[in-house]
Regions:
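Small-residue-enriched flexible segments
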Residues: 1-34, 38-55, 59-345, 349-362, ...
Length: 394
């Protein structure tokens, strides 16, 4: 297996495609089998995908829009004309396929269709892939995961992120060989010939404050412990959230999301987070994940320092899960929450440096998403917010 990355800050899609494809071709000695593509909304143009396909014939493309920039082992990349980042993978002894499906009104069906098409593209119909990489718009993630698992089962790690934009205005898009897509699920199935490792964590810790969701609907928490959810959350945050009344609370709630225990490792709880986005006039909280009555929610807290260090620690865990030292890594993919990135934007060079320390010399591509998907240690696939999800090869 060979892995290479490239980026471009060019002011036109065709030039960005030329620069990145030329760099990949030079490093890999030809076109990759799998091309992972992330770009800011400014560069989400059909011409970008068309030019990449022309320059790298045969490469199967998967990816989506990334909030404000991308990152590689060369640094954090953003510019006035947007940014493009690519990772190319060559693995003659492995198999890879990408499939896409329109979301429609049934996310589960779209996830099932996309993964079935990906298996056909890989030439591995009806087999269970080693890994799955996914990209979809925000808001449908649990359904997409359920659909993928309805085809391949629940034991295959599903890793990825929900496409993002700059202003939470719906400008997010998905990428596949067909072009720039809107409201689609794009799935890659991976049968790598090398070792692999995956990890899914956050940079937050529980505060000791928790409650039971006693009323909920889809992605709204109406009551916690039979009290208005906003009132409880406002008390937990000591009035920081809710002091201005109803409205958007996304930025102010970033340091204090809600967490649910997804699994335990040697008695240590592993949390998946939900980011409160809106405080309703009736005291309800709207999240970026589904929530159910009976869920126990913990108020979590994270600092800029913990968010900066977490990406490297997740890479460490992914390599350990794969059974090799970070220095022996061939490369990897990193999904880093867009909200966390905005919270520590001035320190993104430090985030990149933490990843470099964890797998020195290895290429990687990172995107900033509005929802993260990953596998907890027992291969329990989950969707969360404010998380870091990583896939490494060694």
């Amino acid at each position: 297996m060979k892995i290479a990355t490239a980026f471009s800050l060019a002011d036109c899609a065709e030039q960005a495609a030329f620069e990145t494809s030329r760099a990949l071709h030079g490093q890999l000695g030809g076109a990759p089998q799998l091309l992972v593509l992330y770009a800011t909304e400014h560069r989400a143009e059909p011409a970008l995908v068309a030019a990449l396909s022309a320059h790298l014939p045969g490469a199967q493309i998967i990816g989506g829009t990334s909030c404000a920039g991308v990152m590689t082992e060369k640094g954090f990349h953003c510019g006035p004309d947007g940014a493009v980042g690519v990772l190319g993978l060559v693995d003659p002894e492995g198999a890879y396929g990408v499939g896409a499906s329109a979301l429609g009104d049934d996310a589960q069906a779209a996830g099932a269709t996309a993964v079935a098409r990906a298996l056909v593209a890989a030439g591995r119909d009806f087999e269970i892939p080693t890994l799955v990489w996914c990209c979809q718009p925000p808001g449908c993630e649990e359904g997409v995961l359920a659909g993928i698992q309805s085809v391949i089962g629940a034991r295959t790690p599903i890793i990825g992120g929900s496409s993002a934009d700059e202003a939470i205005a719906g400008a997010w898009r998905q990428f596949a060989s067909e072009g720039v897509l809107q409201d689609h699920v794009v799935v890659a199935v991976l049968f790598p010939s090398t070792r692999h490792g995956a990890a899914f964590q956050s940079g937050y810790a529980p505060t000791g404050l928790f409650g039971v969701v006693t009323r909920a609907q889809d992605r709204q928490v109406l009551e916690i412990d039979h009290r208005p959810a906003g009132e409880v959350y406002g008390h937990w945050t000591e009035g920081v959230v809710g002091c201005d009344g109803a409205g958007a609370i996304l930025a102010m709630s970033t340091p204090t999301p809600l967490g649910r225990v997804a699994a335990e490792v040697q008695g240590v709880p592993m949390f998946v987070l939900s980011h409160p986005a809106l405080l309703g006039v009736a005291g309800d909280l709207s999240l970026f994940t589904d929530i159910s009555e009976g869920d126990v929610v913990h108020m979590m807290r994270g600092s800029p320092e913990s968010l900066v260090k977490r990406a490297g620690l997740v890479i460490d865990d992914a390599c350990a899960m794969g059974g090799w030292r970070g220095a022996d890594s061939l490369g990897g993919l990193v999904i880093y929450c867009g909200g966390c990135m905005l919270h520590v934007r001035d320190q993104m060079d430090e985030v990149v440096e933490e990843i470099r320390r964890s797998m020195p010399g290895a290429p990687f591509l990172g995107a900033f998403t509005f929802g993260e998907q990953g596998a907890i240690v027992d291969s329990c696939n989950r969707h969360g917010n404010l998380m870091v999800s990583a896939l490494t090869f060694g």
